[in-house]
UniProtKB/Swiss-Prot annotation:
Residues 51-94, 165-187, 241-273 are annotated as: Disordered. Its main location: nucleus. Residues 55-73, 241-270 have a biased composition (Low complexity). The keyword Nucleus applies. GO terms for molecular function: DNA binding; GTPase regulator activity. It comes from Saccharomyces cerevisiae (strain ATCC 204508 / S288c). GO terms for cellular component: nucleus. It is found in: Nucleus. Residues 90-158 form the Myb-like domain. Present with 1340 molecules/cell in log phase SD medium. GO terms for biological process: fungal-type cell wall biogenesis; positive regulation of transcription by RNA polymerase II; Ras protein signal transduction. This is Negative RAS protein regulator protein. Residues 165-177 have a biased composition (Basic residues).
Amino acid sequence: MYLEYLQPKLNLMDESSTISKNFPDYSPNLNTPITSNFNEETGSDCSLVTPRIISSSNSNSNSNSNSNSNSNSGSIDENELNNSNSSSSSARQIRKKWKEPEDIAFITTIMNNSQLLTFVEYFKPMKNFWKKISKILFQQYGYERNSRQCHDRFKVLYTKSLKVHPSKKSKQKKKKSKQEAGSNLNFDPSKLSRMQYLLVQLQNTFSFVNGNIILKSQKTLKPNKNGTNDNINNHYYNNCNNNNNNINNSNNSNNNNSNNINRNSNHSTNVFSTPEHIQSSINLDKLESLPALDTKGEPSFISPAQFSLLSSAPADNLILQTPPSPFFQQTMPIQLPRDAQQEQISPVFSTDVIYMWQTMFNTIENLKEQVNCLKNEVKQLNHKFYQQNKPLHNMSTSDSENFMQQH
């Protein structure tokens, strides 16, 4: 009896295993309680024979609801992604294209500020140079570009300049025919537009190596050894003759001024009158016309001891006598020997040195004349001061003697 009761239960377990294999979504409800509905004819329980099976309609509805929920969530996510992409694209800065007026302003700014590359702070790192260029571009022309955009645009313009100038183009391409090389010689810069002309100037001024802009050095023309030395020497000797004539004229004028001073000192009787020799001896035009001298580079030709000796000298010696020196005794400029070594020396350097020494010699001669004039004025003023104080001194001594005699 007990075995007959358990037989349907075992059959039910076998059926559930087969159904689960065939239908993966099927899940039998094993939580139903075992009741006493026992059929004596069949020997089985009705509640156990007919198990509860989930209806397909419910499963379909659940699957539909799950799919709908998934689809709704997916649509929401897509909308959120679209909104985020649109907001990020609107917030992203759009790079404007460079137009020709902006390119012209950019090249002009670089050409005008090319000397910044000679300073270390703008060359290392190069980023400082492009920051300065972008700042000047905005201040002068109103175009707002950052340093990275300026660097990239220069690279593009430099490659364009290689295509504009045919001589540069021929250097890069090694395989060219002779006809193309001959056509490059007929290059006419007057036929270029303003933009093309600026590109050629950009190519001639800068070089672009490994992302760094380098300022090209200015080329200096070397003179010929045959004709230039003779011309320079002739020009040098002409200048020497002119300078000697000027020195002689200045010496003659100095002698005339000293003679006038002596005459005025002999004929001056009124002690309290204004000395006229001071006005005649001082030449204000000569003082203003002298160039400014650098005292650090000039040798001191009057020492303090010599100045004290000169100040204590008698009033008769009205001309300043400078100490003997080979520098002041030189009346002719230095003449360099012309030999094989002279040809090796650069003529520009030699003429610069000669001109420098000649100008120094002329200025020192003019200063000597001025010092002589000032020394003469000081001596004349000291002489007049002594004459003015002499009667006062005599009066004071006589009064003191009378006072002593009375008392």
